[in-house]
Amino acid sequence: GAALPSMRLLAKELHISVPTITKLVQELIEEKIVNDLGKVETPGGRRPNVFGLANSAIYFAGVNVGRDNMTYVITDLQNNIIKEVTDSSFELQNRPQCLEKICSNIENFINDCGIDRAKILGLGVSIVGRVNPETGRSYMYFTSSEESLRDIIEKRVNIRVLLENDTRARCYAEYNCSRSKEESNVIYL
């Protein structure tokens, strides 16, 4: 993995003096955004302290819009699930009322999840059918609007949204959160 940053490395990378970076990092530690991870062994000289983002500094939200349910999840930086809810009463229909329900369900989950909205860096939304993640459009559902599905949801929840096909999203999650990362070739069925 990548080396954890020390004060000297942070100062060099950010073109800031060591005293200034020390003050800034101390403020981030006080705000519980950064953790002091302790000293590391070096070939010689003083052992520097290294720093990393605190798990509670940033969160991610995920929503799977299935044909007959919706699943919502909040994770921290280490992919630990903080909260997960499944709504089995949801039924996907290609109607404006259903899009309104999707948006209000997501808003309610975000509001009730117990995490400060400002700490939720992004929202991944997966939906069945063909999706263009670059344009944020679904080719099967809610296609009558000039705005993409991603943009509609993003405006409603006020969090950056990534829209993806449900199978690709599950494959990516399986690859990213499991031992599959050690493999050079993976097939997802």
State the predicted function of each range.
Residues 84-185:
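Glycine-rich phosphate-binding loop and adjoining helix at the ATP-binding site
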Residues 47-84, 187-189:
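Gly/Thr-rich phosphate-binding beta-strand-loop-beta motif of the actin/hexokinase/Hsp70
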Residues 36-58, 163-186:
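Conserved phosphate-binding catalytic cores of ATP/NTP-utilizing and phosphoryl-transfer enzymes
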Residues 17-24:
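Short coil turns linking two alpha-helices in DNA-binding domains
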